[in-house]
Design a protein with these regions (language model features):
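N-terminal export signals
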Residues: 6-24
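Positively charged n-region of N-terminal signal peptides that target proteins for export
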Residues: 1-5
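Compact, glycine-rich, soluble single-domain proteins
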Residues: 25-157
Length: 157
């Protein structure tokens, strides 16, 4: 058992660590790009923020309270990798689309639960993960096998 007196300094230190994110001092800036997802229901354009650096990937969409309907984040890996995600400090539900090196969606995890520490991944290596508002994939009919058009996949047409 930890004495109550020792809990106060730990609590203050923990809150101090969290507060640096709330003031934006250490929050990453993200470049933006557009991508298109081609599905049986049509072509769907999104303006995405690009997470390329380890710091950007670590932060992702943490601490956001909303996301525009046509917005998202693209996590770009230099080589196909067994990417795993979680929802720590993420305040909104997200759909996670796992995309192979050819731009094909290989797995979709729909409506990931905010703040969950469950590990989410794909069964095969991916070149990218796209995070969209929770429910977007179902609403637009986006499914595994659909194509993502973006320069990182070499298929901009």
């Amino acid at each position: 058992m930890i004495p109550r007196r020792s809990l106060l300094p730990m609590l203050v230190a923990s809150l101090a660590g969290l507060s640096r994110f709330s003031v934006g001092a250490d929050l990453q800036q993200f470049p933006t790009s557009e991508l298109t997802i081609v599905s049986a229901s049509g072509s769907h354009r999104f303006k995405v923020e690009l997470a390329k650096t380890p710091a950007q990937m670590t932060q992702g969409l943490m601490f956001r309270t909303s996301l525009a309907p046509d917005a998202g984040m693209l996590f770009e890996y230099q080589q196909p990798t067994a990417a795993t995600m979680w929802m720590r400090n993420t305040l909104i539900p997200l759909d996670m689309l796992f995309v192979d090196a050819q731009g094909r969606i290989v797995n979709i995890h729909e409506r990931a639960v905010p703040q969950s520490l469950d590990v989410i991944g794909a069964a095969e290596p991916v070149r990218a993960v796209i995070e969209l508002n929770g429910g977007t994939a179902a609403r637009l009919g986006i499914e595994p096998g659909d194509r993502v058009i973006h320069p990182i996949f070499g298929n901009t047409s």
